[in-house]
Swiss-Prot record:
F-type ATPases have 2 components, F(1) - the catalytic core - and F(0) - the membrane proton channel. F(1) has five subunits: alpha(3), beta(3), gamma(1), delta(1), epsilon(1). F(0) has three main subunits: a(1), b(2) and c(10-14). The alpha and beta chains form an alternating ring which encloses part of the gamma chain. F(1) is attached to F(0) by a central stalk formed by the gamma and epsilon chains, while a peripheral stalk is formed by the delta and b chains. It is found in: Cell inner membrane. GO terms for cellular component: plasma membrane; proton-transporting ATP synthase complex. It comes from Burkholderia cenocepacia (strain ATCC BAA-245 / DSM 16553 / LMG 16656 / NCTC 13227 / J2315 / CF5610) (Burkholderia cepacia (strain J2315)). This is ATP synthase subunit delta. Keywords: ATP synthesis, Cell inner membrane, Cell membrane, CF(1), Hydrogen ion transport, Ion transport, Membrane, Transport. InterPro entries: ATP_synth_OSCP/delta_N_sf, ATPase_OSCP/dsu. HAMAP family: ATP_synth_delta_bact. GO terms for molecular function: proton-transporting ATP synthase activity, rotational mechanism. F(1)F(0) ATP synthase produces ATP from ADP in the presence of a proton or sodium gradient. F-type ATPases consist of two structural domains, F(1) containing the extramembraneous catalytic core and F(0) containing the membrane proton channel, linked together by a central stalk and a peripheral stalk. During catalysis, ATP synthesis in the catalytic domain of F(1) is coupled via a rotary mechanism of the central stalk subunits to proton translocation. This protein is part of the stalk that links CF(0) to CF(1). It either transmits conformational changes from CF(0) to CF(1) or is implicated in proton conduction.
Length: 179
């Protein structure tokens, strides 16, 4: 995984520099669409087929993207470069790193919130507001429900984890009692 990140980083950074000259959000959408297409086993199979030219593979990827940027020369050059260098499989990692660069530029971060129970809109807004004060940045939350937490929430922002779940407290108590 670290190898993929290392290989994908220069591509993501180069694409981000291109995106800074235009609409970063639109470029983010395009790279996410391309990553979804590149995850399909059929696309990877076609891309590795000797019967299909590299130009055809690039055209296939761009045709599958709905973003209007896909028709632009910069997008075509980017995809053609990935195809020529046999880097299509890196698109999901490139998209992830592009999103991280975008978040960094916006002073934002993705927050994965796992709750023991479904959160209604007001509870989620209150939680996100408190978390934004704690982490000192704008958060983009994704919420999951995991009843095995018993109660509370576990929040992951980047490499930081805030676990206030009952399960974590019980595990901490168990460790203290058995030590």
């Amino acid at each position: 995984m670290a190898e993929l990140a290392t290989i994908a980083r220069p591509y993501a950074e180069a694409l981000f520099r291109v995106a800074e000259g235009g609409d970063i959000a639109a470029w983010s959408t395009l790279v996410q669409e391309l990553a979804q297409v590149a995850r399909l086993p059929e696309v990877l199979s076609v891309a590795s087929s000797p019967k299909v030219t590299r130009t055809q593979v690039a055209e296939l990827l761009l045709a599958a993207a709905k973003s209007p940027l896909a028709a632009g020369a910069e997008a075509k050059n980017f995809v053609q470069m990935l195809v020529d260098n046999h880097r299509i499989a890196l698109l999901p990692e490139i998209a992830e790193q592009f999103e991280a660069l975008k978040n960094e530029r916006e002073g934002a971060a993705d927050a994965e919130i796992v709750s023991a129970f479904p959160l209604n809109g007001a509870d989620l807004d209150s939680l996100v507001s408190g978390l934004e004060r704690k982490f000192k940045r704008k958060l983009k939350p994704t919420v999951e429900v995991d009843s095995s937490l018993i109660g509370g929430v576990r929040v992951t922002v980047g490499d930081e984890v805030l676990d206030t779940s009952v399960r974590a407290r019980l595990a901490s108590m168990q460790a203290a009692l058995t030590a």
